[in-house]
């Protein structure tokens, strides 16, 4: 097997870039966009490059490629993973390798805790609230392994939940419906008022007590409902106001932690985006059912918080069925979110994807499926300098009355996600334009969580750029299956420079520089 595997999910400025070279004998190249920055040969199965400026890089050898990024703060380009099993004696190597392979620079430790209102356990081994056996020693070892792999271990914590054993203590601070019944999740968790000073003091102290495990921060969860509720005395609690205040309180009381709050189904992103947290995280549910909805969620979140990276948690229940059809759905999801400047929470454990909100019941996937998905993450990391610093100019440059960019294909071309079409978008990037092409031509719908028809490479796509000066622009193409930017030779007409693209599967990026506007 030939593989290039970064030593870390993300490297820090001033840190040497170290890559495992498995089965690689020849030269290994470090590339920024289309410029070879350095070249080295493996020594003892490892390649090392000198520290590099912040940004995304490709790493290529004959028969293998990967990507790395150099970031002072990993959460400026987050790639979120998960772990959810902590049995005694569990090995950690597989999780660490998956973190490195998918460049997962933050990992959620889902349901690692003793109880929702008492995170640290009374004993080293215990059963969690749903009966899963947990070893705190295993949690510690996984935290250490994830950290060593260049990732931030994030402890799951629900912001307003208590179990049956704690409800009598907290009932006076409970959240109730108008008929007096308590708000609950299922039949085992009761919601408490997140504005209660008694609860806030307890909650932040409970969070602080977990830092000795080695966590870098917290995944602050809520359940989407209620959006408003009553206290026992009839006082109305508005969660739109309560959640940002809680986030800020956690940041003030546990200032050394990095925090991620779950905006369930986009509620209340408009309010929490200004709170003191690392990024904007949205767990996606109906009625956000289409690829267009995923695109809208990322776009809106970036507009609300321009300096906040965006993560979508869009669980693929399609993986409970045919894996090939689910992989195609994943490819379309990743292409959509990455090309809009967001990232996703989907991969984790040793080789698993999330199919529902209870992470313990994740789905293990085949090595070939994992490898196909990894190539999409590689592309997003390699070209992060373009994808995460882009302005969408599709509506002013492509389609309709616009003349700046033209796309021809064997199928219809659309500027929105449309089943049966090639979805084209134009992004303004430093020094030029980036055209994103997502192939939906074989699909009957654009539902993101539905099995998809496996795409065959689309051929005969032509991209034309309106000439701005005498010098022809430089055009190059990259895709998950061919990640190195490959130069394209344009044909010149009176007004346009046109290239015919090589066939590509599902997603391609065309970079246009020098003369593009």
State each model region's role.
Residues 65-115:
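An acidic-aromatic substrate-binding cleft motif
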Residues 492-517:
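C-terminal beta-strand-rich structural cap/linker in extracellular carbohydrate-active enzymes
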Residues 222, 306-398:
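Aromatic/acidic polysaccharide-binding cleft in carbohydrate-active enzymes
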Residues 113-159, 234-242:
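Aromatic-lined substrate-binding rim segments of carbohydrate-active enzymes
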Residues 26-27, 33-76:
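Extended acidic/polar, glycine-enriched regions
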